[in-house]
Amino acid sequence: MLKKRVEEALNAQINAEIWSAHFFLAISLHFAENGYPGFAARMKYQHQEEHRHALRLMDYVIEQGGKVELQDIMDIPSDFGDPVESFEQVLVHLMRITD
């Protein structure tokens, strides 16, 4: 059984991974819609990686007898600008999540 504090921390990380996955999916769609299929594919890969992280953590929480608490996904950007501006947003996001 997980300690409450550990379960809460894992749930926070799960939700952060899910938010990150949606961020990368949104930017992948932005690139696809604007004629950058290579960039779109790379961001889709990042989406899948973040999603896998969330799933692994969910499995762990459940295996340990904990409860996964999913939160609403909010405030995903929708305006990414040109490719340089888009990758600047990716850089800011990556710096925030790896801090």
Regions found by a protein language model. Give the residues of each.
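Iron-associated oxidoreductase/ferritin-like identity signal
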Residues: 1-99
